[in-house]
Amino acid sequence: AWDAILHGATGIMWWGSAYADRPHPFFDGWMTVLREFEGLHPFLFAGQMPHVWAETYYRQHDPILGVGVLARRAGNRTLVVLINQDQYAHETVLKGLDEAVVMRLRRVGGGGEGLVKTREGFITALEGYEVRIYITD
């Protein structure tokens, strides 16, 4: 889903489940996804922040698609999503975001490694196909 949003999707089209058995594990997962996207609604239509990008450095393999970055601002909140589109781990440098904004970003869904300031930007390591979500409070 994040890859679709990265490439321009702004919603999910669903045309029904009248013939599906209930209860079904698929619907539990589907409703979880819909609830998560409901909270993202303001960011889906906000448009990409200009001049924000990610540079990908390989660990063991050259990047194929590399890491995409979704950076959007809605009101006084900022959402940054790093999406590793490759099966391989990559070092990623986030560039173009003001340091004051980056210092306010909080990782969604777990601790672990954050964004570390370097001369070039803010670096972090992403595993293959990993999605890392940050949002300001």
Protein language model regions, located:
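Solvent-exposed beta-hairpin/edge-strand motifs
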Residues: 96-111
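Surface-exposed loop/edge segments in extracytoplasmic proteins
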Residues: 111-117
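C-terminal beta-strand-rich structural cap/linker in extracellular carbohydrate-active enzymes
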Residues: 117-137
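Carbohydrate-binding surface patches
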Residues: 60-99, 129
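Conserved active-site loop/cleft motifs that coordinate metal ions or position small ligands
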Residues: 12-16, 80-83, 104-107, 135
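Aromatic/acidic polysaccharide-binding cleft in carbohydrate-active enzymes
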Residues: 1-38
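Pol beta-like nucleotidyltransferase catalytic core
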Residues: 25-74
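Surface-exposed, flexible loop/turn segments at secondary-structure boundaries
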Residues: 20, 88, 113
